[in-house]
Swiss-Prot record:
Pfam families (alphabetical): Ribosomal_L18p (PF00861)
Name of the featured protein: Large ribosomal subunit protein uL18
HAMAP family: Ribosomal_uL18_B (MF_01337_B)
Originating species: Solibacter usitatus (strain Ellin6076)
Self-association state and partner proteins as the record states: Part of the 50S ribosomal subunit; part of the 5S rRNA/L5/L18/L25 subcomplex. Contacts the 5S and 23S rRNAs.
Length: 119
């Protein structure tokens, strides 16, 4: 029988394919995005060390009242960029996490760019 491939499994395949080609370094870490139904999360990761350098999410006390919509994604993008700049990070590699570059993911990326991150 042919089994139906679930959306989550397809996204994970795409994400693995992206991650094969994409890696963050200390000079240019990876800005990873995770999108759930209710919230959005962003992390700046140094893959060489295996460490999260900066993170922000709509669950944080700074972004809690925003929810998981496009406005929240913009706020989280701005917040993660500000936190990264405080740590001296100016340039990142964007990892969309297998999601389409549209809607909340695009809003987060645009807000991070406007706040001063380069990618």
């Amino acid at each position: 029988m042919i089994r139906k491939i679930e959306k989550k499994e397809i996204r994970n395949r795409i994400h693995r394919r992206i991650r094969r080609k994409l890696s963050g370094t200390a000079e240019r870490p990876r800005l990873a995005v995770f999108r759930s139904v209710a919230h959005i999360y962003a992390q700046v990761i140094d893959d060489a060390q295996g460490q999260t350098l900066v993170s922000a999410s709509s669950v944080d006390k700074d972004g809690k009242s925003k929810g998981g919509n496009v406005a929240a994604a913009k706020a989280i993008g701005k917040l993660v960029a500000e936190r990264a700049k405080e740590k001296g990070i100016k340039s990142v590699v964007f990892d969309r996490g297998g999601y389409q570059y549209h809607g909340r993911v695009k809003a987060l990326a645009d807000a991070a760019r406007e706040a001063g991150l380069e990618f």
